[in-house]
Structure formats: structure tokens, C-alpha cells
Amino acid sequence: MPHILMIATGGTIACCETAHGLSPALDSAALLGALPELSALCTVETLDLMQLDSTDVTAADRQRMAQAVWQNREKFDGFVLTHGTDTLAYTAALLTHLLPHFDKPLVLTGSMLPMGVPDSDAPRNLLDAFRTAADGRAGVYAMMNGQILHGSHVFKQHSTKIDAFLSANAAPAGEIRESEVHWNTPASVPSGEPQLVEQIDTHILPVRLTPDLDPSFFSVLLGYPKVVLEAFGAGGVPARLESAVRDLIQSGTRVYITTQCPEGGVHLHKYEVGRRAEALGAISLGSRTFEDALGALMCGEL
């Protein structure tokens, strides 16, 4: 029987109502108490790593999560990590890059409603996450609403609906149907040895372009290590900003371009405005989600 480590970090799934609103309070034992059928699926140990609203989760916290997984990888067949949904996409993406070529299943999950409230999605999501981890396929995934999402393609598209997540720019990795794990593609062949990335760079500044953004704004960014421009559509940068972007690049700043669209990616070659941005030296982030691009940049992959 698979032996799984559950790492609890807080989030809505662990929330209780307080005088100041929902706040994480339930520990891993309380969450597991809602899953009597789990004992027939796998054996479980728990680690209560932190108790945070995911809004408060930092890069250092995500490094702690990666370290907890890495330090226990020889002892367990897989991992389930409970997490708040608001920044789950950021955590799934960064863990994908902090643990490249990971050779065990690491499945993140959470819920849009707290455990124990009527019609909560928490019991289903948590049980499905254990099903996915127990299945044994290596990699970093998120399990939400019956869908298994690759960690690098997770996108939260709605702030309240149960069906809040989509797999951006890629088909879901799989799904749970009739309590069984069904994968959409064959397991990938590892392309390297598992490792833990221990050094990250958080000096990355996203700038969301708007139609009337003042070009003078860019002067305060001169020399900043890395800037990600969230551009329009396929990657267009307005002509009136080109001089400011050129100065930014010439100052030594690496400028990357992503899109404000949740899906479709960047295609700088498609329009003249994109080709001009590329000629300035801006770097396309292609079909990466913003969260995945941020994780790759933090880990020095780009």
C-alpha cells in the first residue's frame, strides 16, 4: 500500500469562521478526519508545516515546502500538500522548478469552501489528491474539482466558483472518474536527476501595461535585474513606450514579455508591434503562464 506524506500549509480548506472572517485553523488530523475511506487507499503520515492564508505565503515559505518534500523523498511514495487556492498556481509552478525531475508524485490541493461546511469541495479534492499521489506517477500536480493539472499550467480563473481552475495552454494531465485516476497522456520519461534548487532570485518585477501607461514610469526601473511586461494580446508593446523599453534594456535590465490573456501565449512575430519589441531585445515567454514564468525566472532557468 502506498505510503503518503500529507503536508498541511493552511488555506481555505483549513479555515474556520472567526469574528474577523475566515482564517486557517484546522490541522492535518482534522482534515483527515473527514476522509474515513482513506485507510483503504494508502497509509498516511502528516506534517503541519505552516498555517497560512495563501495570500501570505512567500517565496521563503515555498522553499520550506520544497525542502520538506526533498528531505522526505526516500521515506514516502508520494506527497499531498494542502494549500490555499488564491496563490496555489504560484506555489505549484515554483515547486515544479524548485524540484526539477522530481521522481515522486507531489499533488497540491485546496478547496473553495472550508472543510466541514455544507457542499464543501474539500473532502472530494483532498481524497482525489491522495488517489493521484497513490497512483504513483512522478511530477508536480494540482488536483482541483476532479482535474489533475500540471504544476506549470495551473491558472485560477474564478474567485468563488467550485470550478475555479483551468489548465492554461495545455490539456489537463488527467482526471478522476468514478474514483479512479485516468491520465490523458503516457508518463513522461525523466530527462535528468532529481534535485532541489536552493538558491532563488526574487528580484523580478511584473509591469502590467495599460493603454495610457506613462513612459516616464520606466525611468525608476533602470538597472533593475529583471522586468516582466504583461503585454496585450500576442505580445504587443505600444509604440510610445518603445523608447522607454529600449532605455530599460540598455541599462542592463532583462525585459521579458508575457500576455495578459490567460491562454494563447506570446507570439511576437505575428504583429509589427511584437516584432518591434523583439528587435529592442525583449524576450518572449512563449506559452508559459505568468506563474510558471515567474518560477522559472526565480530559479535561474531563463
Range-by-range predicted roles:
Residues 1-71, 240-243, 247, 263, ...:
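ATP/NTP phosphate-donor binding region
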Residues 2, 7-15, 28-38, 150-236:
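Accessory alpha-helical/coil subdomains and C-terminal extensions
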Residues 10-11, 80, 129, 146, ...:
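Buried hydrophobic positions in well-ordered alpha/beta secondary-structure cores of metabolic enzymes
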Residues 17-20, 92-93, 118-121, 151-156, ...:
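Short acidic, glycine/serine/threonine-rich loops at helix termini
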Residues 76-88, 223-234:
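Short acidic, glycine-rich surface-loop motifs adjacent to enzyme active sites
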Residues 81-104, 237-246:
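Short Gly/Thr/Asp-enriched flexible loops that form oxyanion-binding sites at enzyme active sites
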Residues 108-177:
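Internal gly/pro-rich beta-alpha loop/helix module
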Residues 235, 239-302:
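ATP/nucleoside-binding phosphotransfer catalytic cores, i.e., glycine-rich phosphate-binding loops
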